[in-house]
Amino acid sequence: MNVFDTLQQSKKLPDVYRQMTRVELEERIRQHKERLGKKLLMLGHHYQRDEVFQFADQTGDSLQLAQIAAKEKEAQFIVFCGVHFMAETADLLTSEEQTVLLPDLRAGCSMADMADIHQTERAWERLQLMFGDTILPLTYVNSTAAIKAFCGRNGGATVTSSNAKKMLEWAFTQKERLLFLPDQHLGRNTAYELGIPLEAMAVWNPETERLETDQPLENIRVILWKGHCSVHEKFTVKHIEHLRKNEPDMSIIVHPECTHDVVIHADDAGSTHYIIKTIESADSGTKWAVGTEMNLVNRLANEHPDKEIVSLNPTMCPCLTMNRIDIEHLCWSLDQLAEGVFQHPIKVEDKDRGPALLALQRMLDRA
């Protein structure tokens, strides 16, 4: 679903919810959770704001949460406090008897939207002409169901930031080259970690429909889709240099959605799960600058007062689309559910379900 479809289908929050106090909203949500019991499963992504995160029955990254939903067979209603592609993945992995709901349909992902299926299919045709049948498509799970389905149809798979290295290794056993969607930075950082030189990577620009490289085509092994996370691109080498000068004893850990320059200048890089576990296990008194979403950084700081934890970018703000899920929309979604209304149900189109699930399963079987 692109941003225009979202705006057309999204329903406006009734004014009454903005007039309610935080206490009133929290109490109503608790009442719904108590009444529905195990029929309701509320999932909270790590980047959610605390006012919503507090109500989650399970927390984690996008794939973890989708897998949890699939295992919770008693849950008829799954309220996904995350963004659209995450709810789609949950819908793919759960049964037809389970309904996945997104409290605010405007909670999308700009990076996922950067890989439009029509642009991707045109790019694939062009790349096949350029390279022949030598390319395997891989997509980050932070992508639409349509892109996952595209990869499934063409022998490819999904990857997460945790298993990207393992999946790229697998991809190169299948084909000579790979197309990595939609985040160029995760693709570049992972390929570089595997020992592939930057010169062997090219960027496909979907706007100009051109391959951006100054190298001979036969030297290209990785084709990176020109997409990025608007949050993680805001971390720069200048932020790192400033900390090195002013806080030399502070460790810097970043997410691999950051640019390559940031990743190689940081002390460590890894998935959201890796960042959380690294800081949790760190010695008391250690100092950390974290290059990832602000809600998570603040939560880590609050949960570990014995350590100094700050954002790598001091002017960072939370992910705007993730922040669309607020306590008012959550309460409204549950009120509607109590009346038998499925507000903003997320359902992957039938034509995409099989191949998208195949792309996910290829990953789950190997990583």
Swiss-Prot record:
Binding site residues for [4Fe-4S] cluster: C109, C229, C319
Binding site for iminosuccinate: H45, S62, Y140, V141, N142, S161, H255, P256, E257, T272
Listed InterPro entries: NadA, NadA_sf, Quinolinate_synth_A_type3
Catalytically driven reaction(s): iminosuccinate + dihydroxyacetone phosphate = quinolinate + phosphate + 2 H2O + H(+)
GO MF terms held by the record: 4 iron, 4 sulfur cluster binding; metal ion binding; quinolinate synthetase A activity
EC number: 2.5.1.72
Details of cofactor binding: Binds 1 [4Fe-4S] cluster per subunit.
Signal sequence region: none
One of the protein's GO biological processes: 'de novo' NAD biosynthetic process from L-aspartate
Transferase recorded as keyword: yes
Localization per record: Cytoplasm
Pathway info: Cofactor biosynthesis; NAD(+) biosynthesis; quinolinate from iminoaspartate: step 1/1
Keywords: 4Fe-4S, Cytoplasm, Iron, Iron-sulfur, Metal-binding, Pyridine nucleotide biosynthesis, Transferase
Cofactor(s) this protein cannot do without: [4Fe-4S] cluster
Cellular component GO terms held in the UniProt record: cytosol
Sequence similarity: Belongs to the quinolinate synthase family. Type 3 subfamily.
Alphabetized HAMAP family for the sequence: NadA_type3 (MF_00569)
Summary of the function given for this chain in its UniProt record: Catalyzes the condensation of iminoaspartate with dihydroxyacetone phosphate to form quinolinate.
Family matches, as NCBIfam families: nadA, PRK09375.2-1, PRK09375.2-4
Full protein name: Quinolinate synthase
Gene: nadA
